[in-house]
Amino acid sequence: MKHSRALRARNWLLFWTLFIGLGAVAGAAAMLLDPSGKALGMDAMLPYFQVLPFAETVFQDFTFSGWALLLVNGLTNLTAAGLLLRKKPAGVILGGIFGITLMLWICIQFYMFPLNFMSTAYFLFGAVQAATGYAAWVFAKQKAFRVDPKDYKNVGTDPRRLVVYFSRMGYVRKMAYEAADRTGAEIYEIMSTERTAGTLGFWWCGRYGMHRWPMPIVPVVYPLKRKVAVNRRRLFLFGQYSRSHKVPRL
Protein backbone atom coordinates (compact mmCIF):
# COMPACT_ATOMS: atom_id res chain seq x y z
CA MET A 1 0.00 0.00 0.00
CA LYS A 2 1.34 3.44 -0.95
CA HIS A 3 1.82 5.68 2.08
CA SER A 4 0.87 9.31 1.72
CA ARG A 5 3.30 12.09 2.50
CA ALA A 6 0.94 13.13 5.32
CA LEU A 7 1.47 9.74 6.97
CA ARG A 8 5.23 9.90 6.46
CA ALA A 9 5.40 13.36 8.03
CA ARG A 10 3.24 12.20 10.93
CA ASN A 11 5.51 9.20 11.53
CA TRP A 12 8.59 11.42 11.52
CA LEU A 13 6.89 13.76 13.97
CA LEU A 14 6.12 10.77 16.18
CA PHE A 15 9.81 9.87 16.13
CA TRP A 16 10.84 13.38 17.17
CA THR A 17 8.30 13.63 19.99
CA LEU A 18 9.39 10.25 21.37
CA PHE A 19 13.09 11.04 20.95
CA ILE A 20 12.87 14.42 22.66
CA GLY A 21 10.29 13.31 25.22
CA LEU A 22 12.08 10.17 26.38
CA GLY A 23 15.42 11.96 26.41
CA ALA A 24 13.97 14.74 28.56
CA VAL A 25 12.42 12.24 30.97
CA ALA A 26 15.77 10.44 31.31
CA GLY A 27 17.62 13.71 31.89
CA ALA A 28 15.04 14.89 34.42
CA ALA A 29 15.23 11.59 36.28
CA ALA A 30 19.01 11.90 36.54
CA MET A 31 18.69 15.42 37.96
CA LEU A 32 15.98 14.50 40.47
CA LEU A 33 17.69 11.32 41.66
CA ASP A 34 20.98 13.16 42.21
CA PRO A 35 20.26 16.91 42.53
CA SER A 36 23.95 17.60 43.13
CA GLY A 37 24.79 16.36 39.62
CA LYS A 38 28.02 14.74 40.82
CA ALA A 39 27.07 11.24 39.68
CA LEU A 40 27.06 12.30 36.04
CA GLY A 41 29.65 15.05 36.35
CA MET A 42 27.04 17.77 35.90
CA ASP A 43 27.99 19.72 39.02
CA ALA A 44 30.51 21.72 36.97
CA MET A 45 27.56 23.23 35.09
CA LEU A 46 25.93 24.81 38.16
CA PRO A 47 28.07 28.00 38.11
CA TYR A 48 26.64 28.83 34.68
CA PHE A 49 23.10 28.78 36.14
CA GLN A 50 23.95 31.69 38.44
CA VAL A 51 23.31 34.22 35.65
CA LEU A 52 19.59 33.34 35.75
CA PRO A 53 17.00 35.13 37.89
CA PHE A 54 16.44 33.69 41.39
CA ALA A 55 19.62 31.61 41.01
CA GLU A 56 20.38 31.83 44.73
CA THR A 57 17.04 30.14 45.45
CA VAL A 58 16.28 27.61 42.70
CA PHE A 59 19.59 26.94 40.95
CA GLN A 60 21.83 25.79 43.78
CA ASP A 61 21.20 22.22 42.65
CA PHE A 62 19.34 20.49 39.80
CA THR A 63 15.99 19.90 41.52
CA PHE A 64 14.16 22.81 39.88
CA SER A 65 15.89 22.19 36.54
CA GLY A 66 14.86 18.53 36.65
CA TRP A 67 11.19 19.32 37.22
CA ALA A 68 11.28 22.05 34.56
CA LEU A 69 12.85 19.69 32.02
CA LEU A 70 10.28 17.00 32.81
CA LEU A 71 7.31 19.33 32.45
CA VAL A 72 8.47 21.50 29.55
CA ASN A 73 10.09 18.95 27.24
CA GLY A 74 9.33 15.51 28.69
CA LEU A 75 5.66 15.08 29.49
CA THR A 76 4.62 17.53 26.78
CA ASN A 77 6.30 15.62 23.96
CA LEU A 78 5.12 12.26 25.30
CA THR A 79 1.57 13.64 25.38
CA ALA A 80 1.92 14.70 21.75
CA ALA A 81 3.31 11.24 20.90
CA GLY A 82 0.32 9.59 22.56
CA LEU A 83 -2.07 11.76 20.56
CA LEU A 84 -0.19 10.94 17.36
CA LEU A 85 -0.43 7.22 18.10
CA ARG A 86 -4.18 7.66 18.57
CA LYS A 87 -4.28 9.58 15.27
CA LYS A 88 -5.67 12.71 16.90
CA PRO A 89 -5.24 15.97 14.92
CA ALA A 90 -4.12 17.72 18.10
CA GLY A 91 -1.01 15.53 18.14
CA VAL A 92 0.27 17.12 14.93
CA ILE A 93 -0.33 20.65 16.19
CA LEU A 94 1.18 20.02 19.62
CA GLY A 95 4.14 18.14 18.15
CA GLY A 96 5.06 21.18 16.06
CA ILE A 97 4.51 23.60 18.95
CA PHE A 98 6.72 21.57 21.27
CA GLY A 99 9.49 21.76 18.69
CA ILE A 100 9.35 25.54 19.08
CA THR A 101 9.29 25.08 22.85
CA LEU A 102 12.53 23.11 22.65
CA MET A 103 14.14 25.87 20.58
CA LEU A 104 13.17 28.45 23.22
CA TRP A 105 14.56 26.17 25.94
CA ILE A 106 17.86 25.95 24.10
CA CYS A 107 17.93 29.74 23.64
CA ILE A 108 18.20 29.95 27.44
CA GLN A 109 21.14 27.57 27.26
CA PHE A 110 22.76 29.75 24.60
CA TYR A 111 22.51 32.62 27.09
CA MET A 112 23.94 30.55 29.95
CA PHE A 113 26.65 28.42 28.35
CA PRO A 114 29.42 29.04 25.83
CA LEU A 115 28.64 27.81 22.34
CA ASN A 116 28.67 24.02 22.43
CA PHE A 117 27.76 21.06 20.26
CA MET A 118 24.96 19.66 22.44
CA SER A 119 22.94 22.86 22.68
CA THR A 120 23.36 23.57 18.98
CA ALA A 121 22.31 20.04 18.05
CA TYR A 122 19.16 20.16 20.16
CA PHE A 123 18.25 23.59 18.79
CA LEU A 124 18.40 22.06 15.31
CA PHE A 125 16.36 19.07 16.54
CA GLY A 126 13.69 21.49 17.74
CA ALA A 127 13.71 23.31 14.40
CA VAL A 128 13.33 20.04 12.50
CA GLN A 129 10.53 18.92 14.83
CA ALA A 130 8.67 22.21 14.35
CA ALA A 131 9.10 22.03 10.56
CA THR A 132 7.94 18.40 10.54
CA GLY A 133 4.88 19.33 12.57
CA TYR A 134 4.02 22.12 10.14
CA ALA A 135 4.53 19.82 7.15
CA ALA A 136 2.35 17.11 8.71
CA TRP A 137 -0.38 19.68 9.37
CA VAL A 138 -0.27 21.05 5.81
CA PHE A 139 -0.17 17.58 4.23
CA ALA A 140 -3.12 16.44 6.37
CA LYS A 141 -5.14 19.48 5.24
CA GLN A 142 -4.28 18.75 1.61
CA LYS A 143 -5.18 15.09 1.99
CA ALA A 144 -8.55 15.94 3.53
CA PHE A 145 -9.38 18.50 0.83
CA ARG A 146 -12.12 17.25 -1.49
CA VAL A 147 -14.03 18.65 -4.43
CA ASP A 148 -17.08 16.58 -5.40
CA PRO A 149 -18.67 17.66 -8.71
CA LYS A 150 -21.96 16.16 -7.50
CA ASP A 151 -22.23 19.00 -4.99
CA TYR A 152 -22.56 21.55 -7.78
CA LYS A 153 -25.97 20.85 -9.29
CA ASN A 154 -26.11 23.91 -11.55
CA VAL A 155 -22.94 23.19 -13.54
CA GLY A 156 -23.65 22.70 -17.25
CA THR A 157 -27.19 24.08 -17.22
CA ASP A 158 -26.20 27.04 -19.43
CA PRO A 159 -24.15 25.73 -22.39
CA ARG A 160 -23.49 29.31 -23.56
CA ARG A 161 -20.99 29.73 -20.74
CA LEU A 162 -17.74 27.93 -20.08
CA VAL A 163 -15.25 27.86 -17.19
CA VAL A 164 -11.71 26.75 -18.06
CA TYR A 165 -9.20 26.08 -15.31
CA PHE A 166 -5.91 24.47 -14.36
CA SER A 167 -5.45 23.06 -10.87
CA ARG A 168 -2.44 21.26 -9.39
CA MET A 169 -3.85 20.38 -5.95
CA GLY A 170 -7.58 20.91 -6.44
CA TYR A 171 -7.99 24.33 -4.84
CA VAL A 172 -8.54 26.11 -8.15
CA ARG A 173 -10.88 23.28 -9.16
CA LYS A 174 -13.10 24.24 -6.24
CA MET A 175 -13.05 27.89 -7.33
CA ALA A 176 -13.89 26.88 -10.88
CA TYR A 177 -16.82 24.68 -9.87
CA GLU A 178 -18.15 27.42 -7.61
CA ALA A 179 -18.01 29.91 -10.51
CA ALA A 180 -19.63 27.43 -12.90
CA ASP A 181 -22.31 26.61 -10.36
CA ARG A 182 -23.20 30.30 -9.97
CA THR A 183 -23.53 30.86 -13.71
CA GLY A 184 -24.59 27.41 -14.93
CA ALA A 185 -21.51 27.22 -17.16
CA GLU A 186 -19.96 24.07 -18.51
CA ILE A 187 -16.49 23.29 -17.22
CA TYR A 188 -13.20 22.17 -18.78
CA GLU A 189 -9.92 21.33 -17.04
CA ILE A 190 -6.61 22.10 -18.73
CA MET A 191 -4.02 19.40 -18.01
CA SER A 192 -0.24 19.83 -18.02
CA THR A 193 2.16 17.35 -19.58
CA GLU A 194 4.63 18.12 -16.76
CA ARG A 195 4.73 16.48 -13.34
CA THR A 196 2.39 18.39 -11.03
CA ALA A 197 1.41 15.96 -8.25
CA GLY A 198 2.96 15.82 -4.80
CA THR A 199 5.90 17.65 -3.29
CA LEU A 200 8.20 16.99 -6.25
CA GLY A 201 5.50 18.33 -8.54
CA PHE A 202 5.39 21.52 -6.49
CA TRP A 203 9.12 22.14 -6.95
CA TRP A 204 9.05 21.05 -10.59
CA CYS A 205 6.17 23.39 -11.46
CA GLY A 206 7.74 26.18 -9.43
CA ARG A 207 10.40 26.60 -12.09
CA TYR A 208 7.78 27.78 -14.55
CA GLY A 209 6.41 30.41 -12.19
CA MET A 210 9.87 31.57 -11.10
CA HIS A 211 11.19 31.98 -14.65
CA ARG A 212 7.79 32.86 -16.16
CA TRP A 213 8.15 30.03 -18.64
CA PRO A 214 5.10 28.80 -20.56
CA MET A 215 4.05 25.41 -19.18
CA PRO A 216 3.26 22.79 -21.84
CA ILE A 217 -0.27 21.42 -21.67
CA VAL A 218 -2.22 18.52 -23.11
CA PRO A 219 -3.79 19.57 -26.43
CA VAL A 220 -7.21 21.12 -25.89
CA VAL A 221 -9.92 18.90 -27.37
CA TYR A 222 -12.86 21.07 -26.34
CA PRO A 223 -14.22 23.35 -29.14
CA LEU A 224 -13.37 26.51 -27.22
CA LYS A 225 -13.18 28.93 -30.13
CA ARG A 226 -16.51 27.86 -31.57
CA LYS A 227 -18.30 28.05 -28.24
CA VAL A 228 -16.93 31.43 -27.22
CA ALA A 229 -17.23 33.06 -30.64
CA VAL A 230 -20.75 31.84 -31.39
CA ASN A 231 -22.26 32.58 -28.00
CA ARG A 232 -20.38 35.82 -27.30
CA ARG A 233 -20.10 34.98 -23.63
CA ARG A 234 -17.25 35.91 -21.35
CA LEU A 235 -14.81 33.08 -20.63
CA PHE A 236 -13.85 32.66 -16.97
CA LEU A 237 -10.28 31.44 -16.66
CA PHE A 238 -8.68 30.15 -13.44
CA GLY A 239 -5.06 29.12 -13.11
CA GLN A 240 -2.24 29.32 -15.64
CA TYR A 241 -1.86 27.85 -19.09
CA SER A 242 0.72 27.79 -21.86
CA ARG A 243 1.09 30.94 -23.93
CA SER A 244 1.09 28.76 -27.01
CA HIS A 245 -2.42 27.56 -26.11
CA LYS A 246 -4.11 30.86 -25.30
CA VAL A 247 -7.88 30.83 -25.30
CA PRO A 248 -9.70 33.80 -26.88
CA ARG A 249 -11.63 35.99 -24.45
CA LEU A 250 -14.50 38.09 -25.76
Residues covered by each model-derived region:
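Topology signature of small-to-medium multi-pass alpha-helical membrane proteins
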Residues: K2-V155, Y177, A229, R243-L250
